[in-house]
Amino acid sequence: MNYMDDASTFERSFLQKARQQHIPITGALELLPLCNMNCDMCYVRLSRSEMECQGQLRTVDEWILLAQQMQKAGTLFLLLTGGEPLLFPDFKTLYLELRNMGMILTINTNGTLLDESWADFFAEYRPRRINITLYGADAASYNRLCHYPQGFDQTVRAIRLLRERNDDVKISCSVTKKNAHDFPKIFVLGEKLGVPVHADHYMMPAVRERSFPFDAQVRLNPEDAAALALQTLKLQLASDIFRQYVHESIHRVNNPSFPRGNGHISCLAGNCSFFINWHGFLFPCVMLSEISAPVFDLGFISAWEKVSAAAQKISLSSQCCQCRLQPICRTCVAAAFLETSSYRGMPGYLCRYSEHYYHLLLAEEASFSSIAL
């Protein structure tokens, strides 16, 4: 979760000040692990019987009491996620209580349950934004990846219902081997619906509560992931801005004086951002579950202080910090740990990703020169 990706200038100012003071201004609540779909790459989804073997859901009253502690600690932005958050009992009660506290709310949903009634609710009590994940461009892709063929039509319908009511919607797309061919179609669909598309081409090998290992065969190989990432930017950016991005990226790689950081967490995680899972453990981010504190037992402020302090102590390897490709690399401490089982490990997948991405940037720059001639 990176709130900065979609933050306005005003929000960025808030976030940066909170980061400097280690105020937990933004967070995410994973309300439950249940979902009506069963996507191959999901690291959260459990069946009801699997969930009950691990524990019970927190009640709406527990979440409200915790949110009151968050409010006192300075939390302003909250993401509600799951699983499928609309399956959470008393979701509307929790949502309205958080809204009445002044929280600025965003929702992650697969959209399949979002009918006219839900759309009317969100039109009356608007969130900041609703992020809807689109897993493919047709029913066949939904069947292959999510084992839920009707999901495509249901999701597109949900997007239309929300846009008809002028709600802010963003399409998220997790690109895998089973739906990579759909991405250009998803981008076109987003344009037709008047909704921006965010595609995630790098899939961290997370497992979390699921009892079986990550299916490495689902994610793209690093070269394909890098190619799709650059293709996405080319589709989304105006040609002059894309050229500028290519030139600046190459310059940063080849400029030894360009800052490469000290290897410590450079995003918001543990600095001013947190994630709380359905069990009630607070993490710096959804992918850093090795650093945690039981928030319902310790209280929010104590759990935040414990996790934030621990997060500031971890760092990447010196090899990663000194690598010339670091300015375009997607490695972070969470990715390093999930790829290698060590914060200071060298994540080979991302090394290959960055190498190929750099060669693609060089090819783009060469094409600019040939066009000019």
Which stretches of residues belong to each language-model region?
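Conserved alpha-helical substructure of the radical SAM core
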Residues: 2-129, 228
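Accessory C-terminal segments flanking Radical SAM cores
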Residues: 28, 195, 208, 213-214, ...
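Generic structural signal for helix capping and beta-alpha/helix-loop junctions
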Residues: 49, 87, 115, 139, ...
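A short acidic, glycine-rich active-site loop
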Residues: 52-56, 143, 310
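Residue-level signal for the nucleotide or nucleotide-sugar donor/cofactor binding architecture
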Residues: 58, 89, 150, 178-181, ...
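Short Fe-S-cluster ligation motifs
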Residues: 66-82, 348-373
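Radical SAM enzyme [4Fe-4S]-AdoMet core and its adjacent flexible, acidic
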Residues: 124-128, 133-135, 140-269, 275-279, ...
